[in-house]
C-alpha cells in the first residue's frame, strides 16, 4: 500500500490484485479496530500501519500467513485485538508464521514453534510438550536455548 492512499483505496488495490481478497471482511475488520475507510494512510502511526497490514493479509483466503513482528509497534490493548484477530479471522486449517521477539504475547496462538538463531533452526517442537518437558514458558526456554 502507498502512503498517499486512503484505506478504501488500499482495499480496492488489494481486491484488484488478489482474487481471494474479501473487501467486505477488510472493511469490517478495519472498523473493529476503530479505523475509518476515508482515513489517509499517511496519517497513520506505525502501530496503525501494522494493524492495516494485518487486516489486509487476513482478508485473503490463504493457506499460509507470514507476519514479521506484527505486535512490535502496538500498545497492549491493540496487541490483544490483533492476537484475537489472528485466531478468529485466519482461514481455518491455515499455517501462520510469526517472527517475533514478544514470545510471551504469542505463546497461546500456536501448536508448534520453531526457534532460530543466526539463521539456523535450533528447536522445532510441539508447544505443549515442550513446555511440559521443560516445565517453563516459551520465553524462558528460548532464553536458555540462546545461551
Each model region followed by its residue ranges:
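Catalytic Walker B motif of ABC-type/P-loop ATPase nucleotide-binding domains
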Residues: 65-69, 74
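Helical segment within the ABC ATPase nucleotide-binding domain
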Residues: 79-92
Amino acid at each position: 500500500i502507498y502512503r498517499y492512499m486512503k484505506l478504501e483505496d488500499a482495499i480496492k488495490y488489494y481486491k484488484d490484485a488478489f482474487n481471494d481478497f474479501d473487501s467486505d471482511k477488510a472493511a469490517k475488520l478495519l472498523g473493529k479496530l476503530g479505523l475509518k475507510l476515508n482515513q489517509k494512510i499517511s496519517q497513520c502511526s506505525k502501530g496503525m500501519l501494522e494493524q492495516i497490514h494485518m487486516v489486509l493479509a487476513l482478508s485473503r483466503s490463504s493457506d499460509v500467513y507470514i507476519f514479521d513482528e506484527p505486535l512490535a509497534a502496538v500498545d497492549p490493548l491493540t496487541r490483544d485485538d490483533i492476537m484475537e484477530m489472528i485466531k478468529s479471522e485466519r482461514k481455518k486449517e491455515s499455517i501462520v508464521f510469526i517472527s517475533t521477539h514478544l514470545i510471551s504475547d504469542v505463546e497461546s496462538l500456536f501448536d508448534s514453534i520453531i526457534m532460530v538463531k543466526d539463521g539456523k533452526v535450533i528447536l522445532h517442537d510441539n508447544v505443549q510438550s515442550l513446555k511440559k518437558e521443560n516445565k517453563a514458558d516459551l520465553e524462558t526456554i528460548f532464553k536458555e536455548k540462546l545461551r
